[in-house]
Amino acid sequence: MPKPHVSSAVMTHPVRLAQAQDLATRLRLDGLALDPDPQGQPSALRTALVAWAAVAPGAGHHLVVQDDVDAPAELLEIVGRSAARFPDEALVFYTNWHARNGAAARLAALAGASWVRAVPDEFTPSLALCLPVEGAAAFRAYARDSAERHDDELLSAFFRGRGRMSLLAVPNVVEHIGTTSINDHAAQGIRLAACPTSAADAAPLLDRGRVLEEPGWIPYMRYGEGYVRLVGQENGADGGRGHHRWRDALPATGLTEEAVRAPRIPKDLATEVARTFGDAFAEELWIHCLLLGRQAARAARSLGPLPDGVPPDALERLRHSAVATAGPAGLPPERRPEAGPDEARAMTALAWAGVRAGESVG
């Protein structure tokens, strides 16, 4: 499989110029894409258009990385091999732990998949995104006259219009750093990867791992409560942006509350979580992970056998990574700093109990 030429750029603002230069040097990226109007109203799209125009002559694909990330030295190698495997796809290498797409990645990890199709009713994670050069040019033409400030929202609109959302790398080798935001996202609190993974594990998974095209309905959490992203909800009047509490969504999932409530929450594990975050959050995390386990078990049955060359131990570490982020990601943003090592261990133990209980539901 010949590796394509992938050019690259780091999106940045003058206030983070040194940080961006260090990132570009460490990762051997081609250069920086500076905000052309740094004194203007904050606009990620304005800088993104510069970044997507920075395609090197002869490149077949172009990678745009934002300046507030960390990644291993192997990033370009991993991206290049992924582009060779999926030459016509938009490939996303970071997924937010608290978003619907993060929940899709978490579900896919538990199912044993290495890639998952992004949902159409949410922004496209754009901290590390690779496009075929034709796609980069088409996006620039599409976005050039837009009044939208957020490139991630416009990318989703662009992909929806083309009838194919991006592919999310389930193992995340790219990590967001810090909570400051030039584009007013700091209120979302600590924002990290859904499934952080080492380059050594990610490389074979992304090279040969399975693709989950349709995960079905997707459980996710926001502000300490459980929700379900329903199949086809993007066709609603609000474009699918509404949020369905898990109880309200059950009829559309084919499950009953009686079935969901049948497994008993482990009191000792719930008490440990509730000690810091309250009984209500402990119960919501339990239900969320139970639904996650149920859907992951269903998805796993649709994936077929594990391909040759996919290390089972790497897949198992990916599963553990996915479950470990479920609790902290599900907390309200203002409570996430309270999740120290002991609290994280307690949430992970309860999350795993929920996932395992859910595997036999429905």
Where would I find each of the regions flagged by the language model?
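Peripheral/terminal regions associated with large enzymatic or DNA-binding modules
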Residues: 2-65, 69-362
